Amino acid sequence: MKYTDEEKKIIDEVKKYLRELRLINIEKFSLTFEIEDIPSPQSIKYSNEVPGGFSKSKGEQITSNMLRRELLTKRLELFNMELDKFMTLVYLLNAGHRNIIRTYVCSRGYNEMIDTLEESFCISKSTYKREFPKACLELSKYLDMEHRPSLEKLNNMFYESIKNE
């Protein structure tokens, strides 16, 4: 399908919007794994021994990890809020476009996205290439392009909230 220059510009803007959401989603998963790797206070990973005098005491280790977990959780909440705002808009699209957009945002890369679309939704690569621009145009009606999500902006909000506490 042929698109006008204005439509092409809108499609590119929506793609940028979606790429930023993808970055936020990838960072969210990294944070989730990082939080899961923090040992609980009951963990046997904590030791009372101080080998070579370089380790913190058990109490300091536990306190440090609890604070770290709390900060990571706050950052994760910011990312979740941004993604949740967007995902509610996706439900305004038809099912095919919704599946394409959601998979685009939630995949780590192109090949993973194409595989997921084919395996989970029976959407071929050629169908994706044909329908993705249409989905972007439809989605653009609902997006606030003036307030595009940004990983950097969310990180700055997080650092400001820490400073203010």
Regions found by a protein language model. Name each.
Residues 36, 105-106, 133:
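Short amphipathic alpha-helical surface patches that mediate protein-protein
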